[in-house]
Amino acid sequence: MSRSLSECIDQGRGLVPADLVLKHGRVFDLVTGELVQTDVAICGDRIVGTFGTYTGRREIDCRGRILVPGFIDTHLHVESSLVTPFEFDRCVTPRGITTAICDPHEIANVCGLEGIRYFLEASAHLVMDLRVQLSSCVPSTHMETAGAALEAKDLAPLLDHPRVIGLAEFMNFPGVLMKDPGCMAKLEAFRGRHIDGHAPLLRGKDLNGYIAAGIRTEHEATTADEALEKLRKGMRVLIREGSVSKDLHALVSILTERHAPYLCLCTDDRNPLDIAEHGHIDHMIRTAIRLGAPPLAVYRAASLSAAEAFGLKDRGLIAPGRRADIAVLDSLEGCHAALVLAGGVVADDAAFSARSGVEPVARASVKVAEIAPEAFRCPGNRAETPVIGILPGKIITEHLTAEIEPVDGDKRPDPARDLARIAVIERHGKTGGRATGFVQGFGMARGAIASTVCHDHHNLAVVGIDYADMALAANRLRALEGGFAVAAGGEILAELALPVGGLMSLRPFEEVRDALVTLREAARSLGVTLEEPFLQLAFLALPVIPHLKITDRGMVDVDRFEILP
Protein backbone atom coordinates (compact mmCIF):
# COMPACT_ATOMS: atom_id res chain seq x y z
CA MET A 1 0.00 0.00 0.00
CA SER A 2 2.94 2.31 -0.61
CA ARG A 3 2.46 5.62 -2.40
CA SER A 4 4.79 7.79 -4.48
CA LEU A 5 6.89 10.49 -2.85
CA SER A 6 4.88 13.07 -4.77
CA GLU A 7 1.62 11.80 -3.27
CA CYS A 8 3.10 11.77 0.23
CA ILE A 9 4.31 15.35 -0.10
CA ASP A 10 1.03 16.68 -1.48
CA GLN A 11 -1.08 14.88 1.13
CA GLY A 12 1.27 16.02 3.91
CA ARG A 13 0.94 19.63 2.76
CA GLY A 14 -2.82 19.29 2.66
CA LEU A 15 -3.00 20.08 -1.06
CA VAL A 16 -5.11 16.97 -1.68
CA PRO A 17 -7.15 14.79 0.69
CA ALA A 18 -5.14 12.19 2.56
CA ASP A 19 -5.90 8.51 2.06
CA LEU A 20 -6.92 8.27 5.71
CA VAL A 21 -7.25 10.80 8.51
CA LEU A 22 -7.61 10.03 12.20
CA LYS A 23 -9.64 13.01 13.41
CA HIS A 24 -9.78 14.83 16.76
CA GLY A 25 -7.59 12.46 18.78
CA ARG A 26 -4.76 13.35 21.13
CA VAL A 27 -1.28 12.19 20.14
CA PHE A 28 1.13 11.12 22.87
CA ASP A 29 4.40 12.73 21.77
CA LEU A 30 7.19 10.44 22.96
CA VAL A 31 9.82 13.15 22.45
CA THR A 32 8.27 15.91 24.55
CA GLY A 33 5.87 13.87 26.66
CA GLU A 34 2.96 16.08 25.61
CA LEU A 35 -0.58 15.02 24.77
CA VAL A 36 -1.48 17.12 21.73
CA GLN A 37 -4.88 17.42 20.06
CA THR A 38 -4.37 16.93 16.32
CA ASP A 39 -5.46 15.13 13.20
CA VAL A 40 -3.14 12.47 11.81
CA ALA A 41 -2.98 12.18 8.02
CA ILE A 42 -1.89 8.92 6.41
CA CYS A 43 -0.80 8.29 2.82
CA GLY A 44 -0.53 4.60 2.03
CA ASP A 45 1.57 3.04 4.76
CA ARG A 46 3.11 6.34 5.95
CA ILE A 47 2.11 9.09 8.32
CA VAL A 48 2.36 12.35 6.38
CA GLY A 49 0.68 14.94 8.57
CA THR A 50 0.36 15.84 12.26
CA PHE A 51 -0.21 19.00 14.30
CA GLY A 52 -2.84 20.33 11.96
CA THR A 53 -6.30 19.81 10.51
CA TYR A 54 -6.70 17.49 7.53
CA THR A 55 -9.39 16.09 5.29
CA GLY A 56 -9.27 12.55 4.00
CA ARG A 57 -10.84 10.19 1.52
CA ARG A 58 -11.60 8.17 4.62
CA GLU A 59 -11.91 9.71 8.06
CA ILE A 60 -12.13 8.02 11.48
CA ASP A 61 -13.32 10.00 14.49
CA CYS A 62 -10.92 9.47 17.40
CA ARG A 63 -12.51 12.03 19.68
CA GLY A 64 -11.76 11.23 23.32
CA ARG A 65 -9.03 8.76 22.39
CA ILE A 66 -5.24 8.80 22.71
CA LEU A 67 -3.00 7.86 19.79
CA VAL A 68 0.32 6.15 20.50
CA PRO A 69 2.88 4.49 18.23
CA GLY A 70 2.31 0.78 17.64
CA PHE A 71 4.08 -1.49 20.10
CA ILE A 72 7.19 -3.53 19.29
CA ASP A 73 7.89 -6.90 20.88
CA THR A 74 11.67 -6.97 20.69
CA HIS A 75 12.21 -10.67 21.34
CA LEU A 76 9.84 -13.58 21.09
CA HIS A 77 9.39 -17.07 19.78
CA VAL A 78 6.10 -17.17 17.91
CA GLU A 79 6.08 -20.94 18.33
CA SER A 80 5.53 -20.46 22.07
CA SER A 81 2.10 -19.05 21.28
CA LEU A 82 1.40 -22.60 19.99
CA VAL A 83 -0.17 -21.24 16.80
CA THR A 84 1.16 -20.40 13.35
CA PRO A 85 2.40 -16.88 12.52
CA PHE A 86 -0.96 -16.19 10.89
CA GLU A 87 -2.96 -16.95 14.03
CA PHE A 88 -0.40 -15.12 16.14
CA ASP A 89 -0.92 -12.06 13.93
CA ARG A 90 -4.69 -12.26 14.36
CA CYS A 91 -4.25 -12.72 18.10
CA VAL A 92 -1.92 -9.86 19.05
CA THR A 93 -2.07 -7.17 16.34
CA PRO A 94 -5.50 -5.92 17.47
CA ARG A 95 -3.90 -5.33 20.89
CA GLY A 96 -1.54 -2.76 19.39
CA ILE A 97 1.50 -4.93 18.66
CA THR A 98 2.39 -3.85 15.13
CA THR A 99 5.98 -5.10 14.99
CA ALA A 100 7.42 -8.30 16.42
CA ILE A 101 11.05 -9.40 16.22
CA CYS A 102 11.06 -13.17 16.32
CA ASP A 103 13.69 -15.83 16.68
CA PRO A 104 12.31 -18.98 15.01
CA HIS A 105 14.82 -21.22 16.72
CA GLU A 106 12.12 -23.57 17.99
CA ILE A 107 11.10 -24.67 14.50
CA ALA A 108 14.74 -24.35 13.34
CA ASN A 109 15.79 -26.92 15.95
CA VAL A 110 13.26 -29.30 14.42
CA CYS A 111 13.78 -28.77 10.68
CA GLY A 112 16.62 -26.28 10.23
CA LEU A 113 16.59 -23.70 7.44
CA GLU A 114 13.22 -24.95 6.24
CA GLY A 115 11.70 -23.59 9.45
CA ILE A 116 13.39 -20.20 9.17
CA ARG A 117 12.33 -19.87 5.54
CA TYR A 118 8.75 -20.71 6.56
CA PHE A 119 8.75 -17.75 8.94
CA LEU A 120 10.33 -15.45 6.37
CA GLU A 121 7.73 -16.41 3.78
CA ALA A 122 4.85 -16.11 6.24
CA SER A 123 6.07 -12.69 7.41
CA ALA A 124 5.40 -11.24 3.96
CA HIS A 125 1.68 -12.02 4.24
CA LEU A 126 0.80 -10.70 7.71
CA VAL A 127 -0.95 -7.54 8.84
CA MET A 128 1.74 -6.91 11.47
CA ASP A 129 5.39 -6.45 10.53
CA LEU A 130 7.15 -9.64 11.62
CA ARG A 131 10.93 -9.35 11.49
CA VAL A 132 13.25 -12.32 11.85
CA GLN A 133 16.51 -12.79 13.70
CA LEU A 134 18.51 -15.73 12.36
CA SER A 135 18.79 -18.45 14.97
CA SER A 136 22.31 -18.51 16.40
CA CYS A 137 22.28 -21.68 18.48
CA VAL A 138 20.83 -24.66 16.66
CA PRO A 139 21.35 -26.73 18.73
CA SER A 140 21.84 -24.57 21.80
CA THR A 141 24.82 -26.68 22.98
CA HIS A 142 26.66 -29.93 22.24
CA MET A 143 24.82 -31.62 25.13
CA GLU A 144 21.56 -32.36 23.31
CA THR A 145 20.28 -33.89 20.07
CA ALA A 146 18.29 -31.49 17.91
CA GLY A 147 16.59 -32.12 14.58
CA ALA A 148 19.05 -29.87 12.77
CA ALA A 149 22.35 -28.04 13.12
CA LEU A 150 22.97 -24.60 11.63
CA GLU A 151 26.46 -23.22 11.14
CA ALA A 152 27.57 -19.79 9.95
CA LYS A 153 27.72 -20.98 6.33
CA ASP A 154 24.08 -22.10 6.54
CA LEU A 155 22.87 -18.73 7.81
CA ALA A 156 25.00 -16.56 5.50
CA PRO A 157 22.68 -16.79 2.43
CA LEU A 158 19.84 -15.27 4.48
CA LEU A 159 21.88 -12.43 5.94
CA ASP A 160 20.69 -9.86 3.38
CA HIS A 161 17.04 -10.91 3.33
CA PRO A 162 14.96 -7.69 3.71
CA ARG A 163 13.08 -9.05 6.73
CA VAL A 164 16.18 -10.24 8.58
CA ILE A 165 17.60 -7.94 11.25
CA GLY A 166 20.61 -9.92 12.40
CA LEU A 167 21.61 -12.80 14.64
CA ALA A 168 19.20 -14.02 17.31
CA GLU A 169 19.94 -14.53 21.00
CA PHE A 170 23.40 -16.00 21.43
CA MET A 171 22.52 -18.47 24.15
CA ASN A 172 25.79 -20.36 24.19
CA PHE A 173 27.56 -17.70 26.23
CA PRO A 174 30.10 -20.24 27.55
CA GLY A 175 30.95 -20.98 23.92
CA VAL A 176 31.53 -17.27 23.29
CA LEU A 177 33.80 -16.92 26.32
CA MET A 178 35.71 -20.10 25.43
CA LYS A 179 35.98 -18.91 21.80
CA ASP A 180 34.40 -22.05 20.42
CA PRO A 181 35.18 -22.14 16.65
CA GLY A 182 31.52 -22.49 15.65
CA CYS A 183 30.49 -19.57 17.84
CA MET A 184 33.35 -17.44 16.57
CA ALA A 185 32.42 -18.13 12.95
CA LYS A 186 28.87 -16.88 13.53
CA LEU A 187 30.03 -13.80 15.43
CA GLU A 188 32.45 -12.96 12.61
CA ALA A 189 29.82 -13.52 9.91
CA PHE A 190 27.43 -11.09 11.63
CA ARG A 191 30.03 -8.56 12.73
CA GLY A 192 28.55 -5.09 12.37
CA ARG A 193 24.99 -6.43 12.27
CA HIS A 194 22.63 -6.63 15.20
CA ILE A 195 23.47 -9.55 17.50
CA ASP A 196 21.01 -10.27 20.29
CA GLY A 197 22.22 -11.66 23.59
CA HIS A 198 21.26 -14.24 26.17
CA ALA A 199 23.46 -14.25 29.26
CA PRO A 200 21.60 -15.05 32.50
CA LEU A 201 23.58 -14.19 35.65
CA LEU A 202 26.70 -13.30 33.62
CA ARG A 203 28.51 -10.49 35.42
CA GLY A 204 31.85 -8.72 35.74
CA LYS A 205 34.65 -9.27 33.27
CA ASP A 206 32.96 -12.30 31.73
CA LEU A 207 30.07 -10.02 30.80
CA ASN A 208 32.58 -7.54 29.37
CA GLY A 209 34.04 -10.24 27.16
CA TYR A 210 30.59 -11.34 26.01
CA ILE A 211 29.59 -7.78 25.06
CA ALA A 212 32.95 -7.22 23.36
CA ALA A 213 31.98 -10.00 20.94
CA GLY A 214 29.53 -7.51 19.39
CA ILE A 215 26.38 -8.39 21.32
CA ARG A 216 24.06 -5.40 21.74
CA THR A 217 20.82 -6.40 23.45
CA GLU A 218 19.83 -8.86 26.19
CA HIS A 219 16.63 -10.06 27.85
CA GLU A 220 17.74 -12.41 30.64
CA ALA A 221 18.20 -9.91 33.49
CA THR A 222 16.07 -10.98 36.44
CA THR A 223 17.14 -8.35 39.00
CA ALA A 224 17.49 -4.57 38.81
CA ASP A 225 21.16 -4.86 39.79
CA GLU A 226 21.88 -7.25 36.92
CA ALA A 227 19.99 -5.04 34.45
CA LEU A 228 21.80 -1.89 35.58
CA GLU A 229 25.20 -3.52 35.10
CA LYS A 230 24.22 -4.43 31.55
CA LEU A 231 22.95 -0.89 30.92
CA ARG A 232 26.16 0.63 32.28
CA LYS A 233 28.14 -1.56 29.91
CA GLY A 234 26.26 -0.31 26.87
CA MET A 235 23.67 -3.02 26.37
CA ARG A 236 20.04 -2.31 25.62
CA VAL A 237 18.04 -4.28 28.18
CA LEU A 238 14.81 -5.96 27.06
CA ILE A 239 12.44 -6.28 30.02
CA ARG A 240 10.67 -9.62 29.72
CA GLU A 241 7.27 -10.80 30.86
CA GLY A 242 6.47 -14.23 29.47
CA SER A 243 4.25 -17.03 30.66
CA VAL A 244 7.02 -18.54 32.79
CA SER A 245 9.77 -15.92 32.93
CA LYS A 246 8.14 -12.96 34.64
CA ASP A 247 10.72 -10.23 35.23
CA LEU A 248 8.67 -7.03 34.97
CA HIS A 249 7.99 -6.69 38.69
CA ALA A 250 11.68 -7.14 39.49
CA LEU A 251 12.83 -4.62 36.86
CA VAL A 252 10.09 -1.98 36.95
CA SER A 253 12.19 0.20 39.29
CA ILE A 254 14.65 0.88 36.45
CA LEU A 255 11.88 1.81 34.01
CA THR A 256 12.37 5.56 34.45
CA GLU A 257 12.43 8.42 31.98
CA ARG A 258 16.23 8.52 32.34
CA HIS A 259 16.69 4.85 31.49
CA ALA A 260 13.81 4.44 29.02
CA PRO A 261 15.86 5.28 25.89
CA TYR A 262 17.89 2.13 26.57
CA LEU A 263 15.06 -0.18 27.61
CA CYS A 264 12.65 -2.25 25.52
CA LEU A 265 9.83 -4.69 26.23
CA CYS A 266 9.57 -8.31 25.15
CA THR A 267 7.51 -11.42 25.88
CA ASP A 268 9.96 -14.16 24.82
CA ASP A 269 7.53 -17.05 25.40
CA ARG A 270 3.83 -16.32 25.97
CA ASN A 271 1.03 -18.82 25.44
CA PRO A 272 -2.47 -18.20 24.06
CA LEU A 273 -4.13 -18.54 27.45
CA ASP A 274 -2.08 -15.72 28.95
CA ILE A 275 -2.57 -13.59 25.84
CA ALA A 276 -6.34 -14.12 25.96
CA GLU A 277 -6.69 -13.60 29.71
CA HIS A 278 -4.17 -10.81 30.27
CA GLY A 279 -2.69 -9.55 27.00
CA HIS A 280 0.71 -9.21 25.42
CA ILE A 281 2.90 -6.08 25.32
CA ASP A 282 -0.29 -4.16 26.21
CA HIS A 283 -0.41 -6.18 29.45
CA MET A 284 3.17 -5.18 30.23
CA ILE A 285 2.32 -1.52 29.68
CA ARG A 286 -0.71 -1.64 31.98
CA THR A 287 1.22 -3.51 34.64
CA ALA A 288 4.26 -1.24 34.56
CA ILE A 289 2.13 1.90 34.92
CA ARG A 290 0.12 0.30 37.73
CA LEU A 291 3.39 -0.47 39.51
CA GLY A 292 4.39 3.18 39.33
CA ALA A 293 6.46 3.55 36.16
CA PRO A 294 5.96 6.89 34.35
CA PRO A 295 3.73 6.48 31.27
CA LEU A 296 6.25 8.34 29.10
CA ALA A 297 9.00 5.88 30.05
CA VAL A 298 6.76 2.86 29.48
CA TYR A 299 5.46 3.92 26.06
CA ARG A 300 8.96 4.90 24.95
CA ALA A 301 10.25 1.45 25.87
CA ALA A 302 7.31 -0.13 24.04
CA SER A 303 7.95 1.66 20.76
CA LEU A 304 10.50 4.44 20.16
CA SER A 305 13.34 2.93 22.19
CA ALA A 306 12.63 -0.50 20.72
CA ALA A 307 12.73 0.85 17.16
CA GLU A 308 16.02 2.62 17.79
CA ALA A 309 17.61 -0.39 19.51
CA PHE A 310 16.98 -2.63 16.49
CA GLY A 311 17.63 -0.09 13.73
CA LEU A 312 13.98 0.25 12.67
CA LYS A 313 14.28 3.96 12.01
CA ASP A 314 10.96 4.28 10.20
CA ARG A 315 8.73 3.73 13.25
CA GLY A 316 8.30 4.44 16.95
CA LEU A 317 6.79 7.93 16.65
CA ILE A 318 3.59 9.41 15.32
CA ALA A 319 5.32 11.84 12.99
CA PRO A 320 5.51 12.62 9.27
CA GLY A 321 7.52 10.08 7.31
CA ARG A 322 7.11 7.32 9.88
CA ARG A 323 5.35 4.04 9.22
CA ALA A 324 1.64 4.31 10.05
CA ASP A 325 1.71 1.98 13.05
CA ILE A 326 -0.77 3.47 15.49
CA ALA A 327 -2.77 2.23 18.45
CA VAL A 328 -5.85 4.25 19.37
CA LEU A 329 -6.37 3.83 23.12
CA ASP A 330 -9.02 4.52 25.70
CA SER A 331 -6.38 5.82 28.12
CA LEU A 332 -2.65 5.57 28.72
CA GLU A 333 -3.20 3.66 31.95
CA GLY A 334 -5.79 1.25 30.52
CA CYS A 335 -3.95 0.62 27.23
CA HIS A 336 -6.96 -1.00 25.57
CA ALA A 337 -6.87 -0.52 21.80
CA ALA A 338 -10.11 0.61 20.19
CA LEU A 339 -8.40 0.72 16.77
CA VAL A 340 -5.03 -0.41 15.46
CA LEU A 341 -3.29 0.54 12.23
CA ALA A 342 -0.35 -1.54 11.00
CA GLY A 343 1.35 0.06 8.03
CA GLY A 344 -1.80 2.10 7.42
CA VAL A 345 -4.04 -1.00 7.38
CA VAL A 346 -6.81 -1.24 9.94
CA ALA A 347 -6.24 -4.48 11.85
CA ASP A 348 -9.75 -5.89 11.60
CA ASP A 349 -11.40 -9.10 10.44
CA ALA A 350 -11.41 -7.94 6.83
CA ALA A 351 -7.65 -7.38 6.85
CA PHE A 352 -6.96 -10.78 8.39
CA SER A 353 -9.30 -12.51 5.95
CA ALA A 354 -7.53 -10.88 2.99
CA ARG A 355 -4.16 -12.48 3.79
CA SER A 356 -2.80 -15.30 1.66
CA GLY A 357 -1.50 -18.36 3.48
CA VAL A 358 1.70 -20.38 3.43
CA GLU A 359 1.89 -24.17 3.58
CA PRO A 360 3.10 -25.28 7.03
CA VAL A 361 6.31 -27.28 7.38
CA ALA A 362 7.73 -30.07 9.55
CA ARG A 363 4.74 -32.40 9.60
CA ALA A 364 5.24 -35.93 11.00
CA SER A 365 8.26 -34.76 12.99
CA VAL A 366 7.83 -37.13 15.96
CA LYS A 367 10.01 -40.06 14.92
CA VAL A 368 9.95 -42.30 17.97
CA ALA A 369 9.32 -46.03 18.28
CA GLU A 370 6.61 -47.15 20.69
CA ILE A 371 7.69 -46.45 24.24
CA ALA A 372 7.35 -49.07 26.99
CA PRO A 373 6.82 -48.22 30.68
CA GLU A 374 10.24 -49.70 31.47
CA ALA A 375 11.86 -46.89 29.48
CA PHE A 376 11.19 -44.57 32.42
CA ARG A 377 13.22 -46.49 34.99
CA CYS A 378 16.09 -44.56 36.57
CA PRO A 379 18.88 -47.02 37.25
CA GLY A 380 21.43 -46.33 39.95
CA ASN A 381 23.36 -47.83 42.82
CA ARG A 382 23.95 -44.78 45.02
CA ALA A 383 21.22 -43.13 47.09
CA GLU A 384 22.59 -39.61 46.55
CA THR A 385 20.71 -38.27 43.53
CA PRO A 386 20.71 -34.93 41.66
CA VAL A 387 17.27 -33.31 41.50
CA ILE A 388 16.08 -30.41 39.35
CA GLY A 389 14.43 -27.88 41.67
CA ILE A 390 11.75 -25.72 40.06
CA LEU A 391 11.51 -22.03 40.93
CA PRO A 392 7.93 -21.01 40.03
CA GLY A 393 7.87 -18.08 37.59
CA LYS A 394 11.53 -18.63 36.65
CA ILE A 395 13.34 -20.73 34.08
CA ILE A 396 16.41 -20.83 36.30
CA THR A 397 16.35 -24.05 38.33
CA GLU A 398 18.07 -25.22 41.48
CA HIS A 399 20.62 -28.03 41.60
CA LEU A 400 19.31 -30.07 44.52
CA THR A 401 20.35 -33.40 45.98
CA ALA A 402 18.08 -36.04 47.52
CA GLU A 403 18.65 -39.44 49.10
CA ILE A 404 16.69 -41.93 46.97
CA GLU A 405 17.37 -45.57 47.68
CA PRO A 406 17.18 -47.81 44.58
CA VAL A 407 14.63 -50.63 44.62
CA ASP A 408 15.48 -53.52 42.31
CA GLY A 409 17.99 -51.24 40.61
CA ASP A 410 15.46 -48.45 40.01
CA LYS A 411 15.18 -45.11 41.81
CA ARG A 412 11.44 -44.59 41.89
CA PRO A 413 9.31 -41.43 42.05
CA ASP A 414 8.25 -40.37 45.54
CA PRO A 415 5.18 -38.10 45.50
CA ALA A 416 5.31 -37.78 49.29
CA ARG A 417 8.54 -35.79 48.83
CA ASP A 418 7.36 -34.16 45.59
CA LEU A 419 9.96 -36.14 43.64
CA ALA A 420 8.62 -36.91 40.17
CA ARG A 421 10.31 -38.78 37.34
CA ILE A 422 11.42 -36.64 34.41
CA ALA A 423 12.48 -38.16 31.11
CA VAL A 424 13.65 -36.76 27.78
CA ILE A 425 13.46 -39.00 24.71
CA GLU A 426 15.10 -38.10 21.39
CA ARG A 427 12.30 -37.75 18.82
CA HIS A 428 14.02 -36.58 15.61
CA GLY A 429 14.86 -40.09 14.43
CA LYS A 430 18.59 -39.70 14.99
CA THR A 431 19.89 -41.53 18.07
CA GLY A 432 16.87 -42.89 19.92
CA GLY A 433 18.60 -41.75 23.09
CA ARG A 434 16.82 -41.06 26.35
CA ALA A 435 17.64 -39.89 29.85
CA THR A 436 15.75 -40.09 33.13
CA GLY A 437 16.06 -38.18 36.37
CA PHE A 438 14.14 -36.41 39.10
CA VAL A 439 12.38 -33.06 39.39
CA GLN A 440 10.89 -31.39 42.44
CA GLY A 441 8.24 -28.67 42.35
CA PHE A 442 5.37 -30.02 40.26
CA GLY A 443 3.39 -31.27 43.24
CA MET A 444 2.27 -34.24 41.14
CA ALA A 445 0.62 -37.07 43.08
CA ARG A 446 -0.28 -39.42 40.21
CA GLY A 447 -0.32 -39.80 36.43
CA ALA A 448 1.90 -38.02 33.91
CA ILE A 449 2.17 -35.10 31.52
CA ALA A 450 4.06 -35.17 28.22
CA SER A 451 5.18 -32.55 25.72
CA THR A 452 7.13 -32.19 22.48
CA VAL A 453 7.69 -28.51 23.28
CA CYS A 454 11.04 -29.00 24.99
CA HIS A 455 13.48 -26.10 24.65
CA ASP A 456 15.41 -25.89 22.52
CA HIS A 457 15.98 -29.31 20.99
CA HIS A 458 12.25 -30.11 21.28
CA ASN A 459 12.61 -33.75 22.09
CA LEU A 460 9.83 -35.61 23.89
CA ALA A 461 9.70 -34.71 27.60
CA VAL A 462 7.61 -36.51 30.20
CA VAL A 463 7.06 -35.89 33.92
CA GLY A 464 5.17 -38.41 35.97
CA ILE A 465 4.66 -40.70 38.92
CA ASP A 466 3.36 -43.81 37.16
CA TYR A 467 5.49 -45.36 34.40
CA ALA A 468 2.49 -46.80 32.54
CA ASP A 469 0.82 -43.39 32.41
CA MET A 470 4.09 -41.82 31.26
CA ALA A 471 4.27 -44.32 28.40
CA LEU A 472 0.61 -43.72 27.54
CA ALA A 473 1.06 -39.94 27.36
CA ALA A 474 4.28 -40.21 25.35
CA ASN A 475 2.82 -42.65 22.85
CA ARG A 476 -0.25 -40.46 22.40
CA LEU A 477 2.02 -37.65 21.24
CA ARG A 478 3.48 -39.98 18.61
CA ALA A 479 -0.02 -40.34 17.16
CA LEU A 480 -0.80 -36.61 17.36
CA GLU A 481 2.40 -35.52 15.51
CA GLY A 482 3.43 -33.85 18.75
CA GLY A 483 1.74 -31.66 21.33
CA PHE A 484 0.68 -31.94 24.96
CA ALA A 485 -1.00 -34.81 26.80
CA VAL A 486 -2.14 -35.57 30.35
CA ALA A 487 -2.67 -39.18 31.45
CA ALA A 488 -3.78 -40.89 34.66
CA GLY A 489 -5.22 -44.27 35.56
CA GLY A 490 -4.56 -45.64 32.10
CA GLU A 491 -6.56 -42.90 30.33
CA ILE A 492 -5.75 -39.74 28.37
CA LEU A 493 -7.44 -36.92 30.30
CA ALA A 494 -6.59 -34.06 27.94
CA GLU A 495 -4.53 -33.38 24.83
CA LEU A 496 -3.58 -30.77 22.27
CA ALA A 497 -2.14 -31.71 18.88
CA LEU A 498 0.74 -29.53 17.64
CA PRO A 499 1.45 -31.06 14.22
CA VAL A 500 3.61 -28.23 12.85
CA GLY A 501 7.01 -29.37 14.05
CA GLY A 502 5.48 -30.70 17.25
CA LEU A 503 5.27 -27.03 18.24
CA MET A 504 2.31 -25.28 16.61
CA SER A 505 -1.35 -26.05 16.11
CA LEU A 506 -3.28 -25.68 12.87
CA ARG A 507 -6.41 -24.80 14.83
CA PRO A 508 -7.70 -21.26 15.46
CA PHE A 509 -6.25 -19.37 18.39
CA GLU A 510 -9.51 -19.59 20.34
CA GLU A 511 -9.61 -23.39 20.13
CA VAL A 512 -5.99 -23.65 21.27
CA ARG A 513 -6.77 -21.38 24.20
CA ASP A 514 -9.71 -23.58 25.22
CA ALA A 515 -7.61 -26.73 24.92
CA LEU A 516 -4.99 -25.20 27.21
CA VAL A 517 -7.66 -24.52 29.82
CA THR A 518 -8.66 -28.19 29.71
CA LEU A 519 -5.01 -29.31 29.89
CA ARG A 520 -4.32 -27.05 32.84
CA GLU A 521 -7.37 -28.41 34.70
CA ALA A 522 -6.34 -31.98 33.92
CA ALA A 523 -2.82 -31.34 35.23
CA ARG A 524 -4.24 -29.88 38.42
CA SER A 525 -6.31 -33.04 38.89
CA LEU A 526 -2.97 -34.87 39.19
CA GLY A 527 -1.98 -32.55 42.02
CA VAL A 528 0.15 -30.23 39.87
CA THR A 529 0.46 -26.83 41.55
CA LEU A 530 2.38 -24.92 38.86
CA GLU A 531 0.50 -22.18 37.03
CA GLU A 532 2.11 -23.11 33.69
CA PRO A 533 3.11 -26.79 33.95
CA PHE A 534 3.77 -27.34 30.24
CA LEU A 535 5.90 -24.25 29.71
CA GLN A 536 7.72 -24.95 32.97
CA LEU A 537 8.40 -28.49 31.74
CA ALA A 538 9.66 -27.17 28.41
CA PHE A 539 12.44 -25.16 30.04
CA LEU A 540 13.70 -28.00 32.24
CA ALA A 541 15.58 -29.31 29.20
CA LEU A 542 17.38 -26.09 28.22
CA PRO A 543 21.07 -26.52 29.12
CA VAL A 544 22.02 -22.85 28.79
CA ILE A 545 19.92 -21.73 31.76
CA PRO A 546 21.41 -22.39 35.22
CA HIS A 547 21.65 -24.51 37.23
CA LEU A 548 20.55 -28.13 36.59
CA LYS A 549 18.75 -29.36 33.46
CA ILE A 550 18.11 -32.60 31.56
CA THR A 551 18.41 -33.45 27.86
CA ASP A 552 18.22 -36.71 25.94
CA ARG A 553 21.90 -37.20 26.81
CA GLY A 554 21.59 -36.90 30.58
CA MET A 555 21.41 -34.51 33.51
CA VAL A 556 23.35 -31.31 32.75
CA ASP A 557 25.24 -29.25 35.31
CA VAL A 558 24.92 -25.90 33.54
CA ASP A 559 27.37 -24.11 35.85
CA ARG A 560 30.10 -26.60 34.95
CA PHE A 561 28.72 -26.98 31.40
CA GLU A 562 28.91 -30.76 31.49
CA ILE A 563 26.73 -33.86 31.61
CA LEU A 564 26.69 -35.49 35.02
CA PRO A 565 28.11 -39.03 35.12
Curated annotation (Swiss-Prot):
Keywords: Hydrolase, Manganese. GO terms for biological process: adenine catabolic process. Its cofactor is Mn(2+). Pfam families: Adenine_deam_C, Amidohydro_1. Coiled coil: none annotated. Belongs to the metallo-dependent hydrolases superfamily. Adenine deaminase family. Gene3D superfamilies: Metal-dependent hydrolases (3.20.20.140), Urease, subunit C, domain 1 (2.30.40.10). Its EC number is 3.5.4.2. GO terms for molecular function: adenine deaminase activity. The keyword Hydrolase applies. It catalyses: adenine + H2O + H(+) = hypoxanthine + NH4(+). The lineage of its organism: Bacteria, Pseudomonadati, Pseudomonadota, Alphaproteobacteria, Rhodobacterales. This is Adenine deaminase.
